[in-house]
């Protein structure tokens, strides 16, 4: 039984992480899941939240994802995220501004499409803010 597996976290824009991991914790839709080497194969949706990565001989790395898919094979784990941002790169001011704009658009909606788009942006901004708070707590 191996002690590490290969992990890839990619978004539509870029590869965020590609390398060895001892374990990860990911925000699956059915709740947080912990993945260790030789885990049973699995394919599941993930929701917005933080993926915690424990790599050999390194500090934990935290990566915000806004949803996507998690595929687990015995020696390879892949996360295909809609959006993925390293925890330290999350911008609280930008997320607060996006939340404010989305709420304003929803309040003054001109079409159902505009309202739905603003609602999705509000959910994304709220999830980012929750991730920022969670990461801040973990560091203190």
From Swiss-Prot:
Instruction: Report the Pfam families cross-referenced here.
Output: ATP-synt_DE (PF00401), ATP-synt_DE_N (PF02823)
| Gene Ontology cellular component list | plasma membrane; proton-transporting ATP synthase complex
Cellular localisation: Cell inner membrane
One annotated GO molecular function: proton-transporting ATP synthase activity, rotational mechanism
What's the main place this protein lives? membrane
Q: Which Gene3D superfamilies match?
A: ATP synthase delta/epsilon subunit, C-terminal domain (1.20.5.440), F0F1 ATP synthase delta/epsilon subunit, N-terminal (2.60.15.10)
Q: How does it sit in the membrane?
A: Peripheral membrane protein
User: Which CDD domains does this entry report, sorted A to Z?
Assistant: F1-ATPase_delta
Keyword set for this entry?
ATP synthesis, Cell inner membrane, Cell membrane, CF(1), Hydrogen ion transport, Ion transport, Membrane, Transport
The record, for NCBIfam families, names: ATP_synt_epsi (TIGR01216), PRK00571.1-4 (NF001847)
The protein's role, per its UniProt record: Produces ATP from ADP in the presence of a proton gradient across the membrane.
Q: Which family does it belong to?
A: Belongs to the ATPase epsilon chain family.
How would you summarize the oligomeric state and partners of this protein?
Answer: F-type ATPases have 2 components, CF(1) - the catalytic core - and CF(0) - the membrane proton channel. CF(1) has five subunits: alpha(3), beta(3), gamma(1), delta(1), epsilon(1). CF(0) has three main subunits: a, b and c.
Protein name as it appears in the record: ATP synthase epsilon chain
The organism's lineage is: Bacteria, Pseudomonadati, Pseudomonadota, Betaproteobacteria, Nitrosomonadales
């Amino acid at each position: 039984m191996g002690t590490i597996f290969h992990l890839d976290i990619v978004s539509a824009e870029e590869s965020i992480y590609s390398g060895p991991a001892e374990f990860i914790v990911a925000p699956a839709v059915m709740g947080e899941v912990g993945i260790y080497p030789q885990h049973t194969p699995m394919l599941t949706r993930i929701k917005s939240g933080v993926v915690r990565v424990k790599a050999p001989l390194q500090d934990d790395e935290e990566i915000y994802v806004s949803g996507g898919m998690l595929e687990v094979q015995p020696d390879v784990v892949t996360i295909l995220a809609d959006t993925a941002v390293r925890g330290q790169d999350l911008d609280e001011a930008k997320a607060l501004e996006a939340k404010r704009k989305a709420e304003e658009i929803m309040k003054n909606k001109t079409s159902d499409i505009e309202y739905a788009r603003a609602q999705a942006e509000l959910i994304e901004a709220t999830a980012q803010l929750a991730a920022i708070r969670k990461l801040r707590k973990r560091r203190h």
